């Protein structure tokens, strides 16, 4: 299915930090008024345990305002993106990841039954909440290989057994091509399983990859083509990734091209996330630039992380949150008037 370059994209905003429904009505109204058609609610393990009815109420408010509800498993099990702590990690150390030296890591291994059960329970709550899309956001292992330390994950007993079943030998301690392929395959298999479980509950899926993940174009296309995947994207957060202003256009354009290529011939729409957190003073205009690059590159769904420039989280707040948020609104407004 060809993607339309320059057409007006769908716009979305991530929303977290508030569980007061009355306050959310004002916040979500602001999001709707700025031209967004969907809102991505974070739903953590704390929400699963303490706020399931509250999440339903929040989502109902957004639906009344015309916002399609997405939910994302915020830091669930330490496997997906987010800053929330994990009850499951604390309660099930035996199910956690191990690095190649045998060290315990603060995240569940996706191969462990504890992780699978946690996802099932989360998806049950997501389906009951009234959400339409589950965003599988930045799936990752707690220790990604780096040359300096030589450490990587996961080499727990479940991963060792899985490797042995296919390779007919022990999982190596040292990183090599075969280990890299196994790690990438493990994450891909996890995402496939999550998408299938979501589909069984009538939920669509959005897959969002880290910018430092695998460059396997074939693997990307296979994930985007999975039944039930409605969006496929990435989080090319340029400031977070250390890119100077002069490199931002090329970096974003390259990412957009890869996402468009991955979704070509599939039912999934390319999705790009715009960084609106940790923006240094003087670089706010890059948000407008980023939205425009994505729009003209054929990204048909553009979302921003997050509402009010993450000002509720001081560790991620920009130098000028109000200016960043105003710039987001200007960038969203520009998509209504500018055509390629």
Question: Model segments located where?
Answer:
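Aromatic-lined carbohydrate-recognition surfaces of secreted/lumenal glycan-active proteins
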Residues: 7-18, 70-74, 134-139, 175-217, ...
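Substrate-binding cleft of secreted/luminal carbohydrate-active enzymes
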Residues: 131, 236-237, 241-243, 268-339
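Substrate-binding cleft/loops of secretory-pathway carbohydrate-active enzymes
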Residues: 144, 194-197, 201-248, 278-297
């Amino acid at each position: 299915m060809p993607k339309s370059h320059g057409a007006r994209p769908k716009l979305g905003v991530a929303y977290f930090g508030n569980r007061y429904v009355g306050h959310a009505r004002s916040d979500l109204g602001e999001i709707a008024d700025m031209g967004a058609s969907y809102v991505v609610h974070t739903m953590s393990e704390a929400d699963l345990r303490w706020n399931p009815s509250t999440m339903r109420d929040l989502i109902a408010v957004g639906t009344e305002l015309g916002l399609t509800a997405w939910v994302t498993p915020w830091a669930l099990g330490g496997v997906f993106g987010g800053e929330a702590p994990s009850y499951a990690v604390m309660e099930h150390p035996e199910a956690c990841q191990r690095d190649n030296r045998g060290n315990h890591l603060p995240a569940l291994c996706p191969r462990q039954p504890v992780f699978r059960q946690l996802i099932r329970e989360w998806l049950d709550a997501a389906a009951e909440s009234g959400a339409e899309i589950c965003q599988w956001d930045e799936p990752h292992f707690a220790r990604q290989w780096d040359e300096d330390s030589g450490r990587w994950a996961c080499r727990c007993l479940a991963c060792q057994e899985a490797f042995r079943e296919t390779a007919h030998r022990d999982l190596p301690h040292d990183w090599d091509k075969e280990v890299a392929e196994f790690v990438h395959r493990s994450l891909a298999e996890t995402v496939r399983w999550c998408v299938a479980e979501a589909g069984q509950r009538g939920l669509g899926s959005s897959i969002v990859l880290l910018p430092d993940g695998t460059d396997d174009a074939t693997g990307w296309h296979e994930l985007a083509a999975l039944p039930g995947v409605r969006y496929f994207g990435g989080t090319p957060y340029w400031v977070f990734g250390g890119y100077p202003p002069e490199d931002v256009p090329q970096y974003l354009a390259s990412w957009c091209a890869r996402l468009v290529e991955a979704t070509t011939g599939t039912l999934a729409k390319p999705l790009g996330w715009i960084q609106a957190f940790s923006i240094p003073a003087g670089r706010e205009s890059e948000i407008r630039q980023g939205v425009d690059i994505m729009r003209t590159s054929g990204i048909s769904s553009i979302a921003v992380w997050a509402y009010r420039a993450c000002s509720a989280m001081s560790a991620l707040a920009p130098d000028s949150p109000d200016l960043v948020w105003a710039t987001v609104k200007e960038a969203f407004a520009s998509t209504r008037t500018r055509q390629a």
